[in-house]
Amino acid sequence: LMFDPRVLRQGKSVVSMSVDGVSAGALAVRAAFVFARTRDSAVTHDFSTRPTVPEPDACPPMPENARRVAPAFASHFELRKAGGAFPVSGAREPEFLFWTRHQDAQGVNPMVAMVALADLLPPAAMACFDKPAPVSSVTWTFDLLHGVPPKGEWFLQRSFSRQSAEGYSMQDMEVWDEDRRLVLWGRQSVALFA
């Protein structure tokens, strides 16, 4: 994969960039990034509400049979179910609530580690599957909400499908640190082949 980064616009506080990933002469991925410096503001509020769940030590680890069918990269993380459903459990509510942490993120930029963690949970609509079936991300956008790295090693992740119809699911994702701060918010559209 060859990457071609480009600055699209650079202002005093914000830089907009695009990156194309090309493989065998064909576009494989196109990403857009916006980097912003923190700024003083008279307007400050936070209406986000962290789900009420037990602490990580009180939550069960991911069962071994679920770990066996998870993608290989998931072996680099620890997951503990804090609420919601398990993937492919035939649940009515398309919501995952898991405490997650890296097995080893030594030497990795904390913001890069956070993005990897945010991509860990499967699409929330998979909670409603009664048997395994393919899924494919169509879009994924996220905002890192603080200019400083998140605190702690455990992060509470919530993924909830807002709507699923005609072969696609639209979901929201939240990641909370140990200080109960919302540190990442995302939205994803997913193609469902079930």
Language-model segment annotations:
Residues 1-194:
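Terminal targeting signals and extreme-terminal segments of soluble enzymes
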